[in-house]
Amino acid sequence: MPELQERIRNFLKESKRVFLVTRKPGWEEYKKAAKITGLGIILIGLIGMLIRIMGILVLGG
């Protein structure tokens, strides 16, 4: 049991250190991340659509 408490204590100590180093992203950084994420979703959707169309053409829908 003391080992578990020590592991929890170490985890909390390391977590606190990480939170002290991190910062909240600014509006520009947030917009950039949102644009990149949106483009990634669109790209994956287009690839899936192309694979589906090719499957319909090859296998005869």
Curated annotation (Swiss-Prot):
Q: Which domain of life is it from?
A: Archaea
Return one Gene Ontology term, BP aspect.
protein targeting
- Keywords annotated in UniProt: Cell membrane, Membrane, Protein transport, Translocation, Transmembrane, Transmembrane helix, Transport
Q: How does it sit in the membrane?
A: Single-pass membrane protein
Gene Ontology CC terms, in alphabetical order: plasma membrane
Transmembrane spans: 39-59
The places in or outside the cell where this protein is found are:
Cell membrane
Q: Name one GO molecular function term.
A: protein transmembrane transporter activity
Summarize the subunit comment: Component of the Sec protein translocase complex. Heterotrimer consisting of SecY (alpha), SecG (beta) and SecE (gamma) subunits. The heterotrimers can form oligomers, although 1 heterotrimer is thought to be able to translocate proteins. Interacts with the ribosome. May interact with SecDF, and other proteins may be involved.
Free-text function comment from the UniProt entry: Essential subunit of the Sec protein translocation channel SecYEG. Clamps together the 2 halves of SecY. May contact the channel plug during translocation.
Q: Which family does it belong to?
A: Belongs to the SecE/SEC61-gamma family.
Protein name as it appears in the record: Protein translocase subunit SecE
The organism named in the record is Pyrococcus abyssi (strain GE5 / Orsay)
Write the gene name: secE
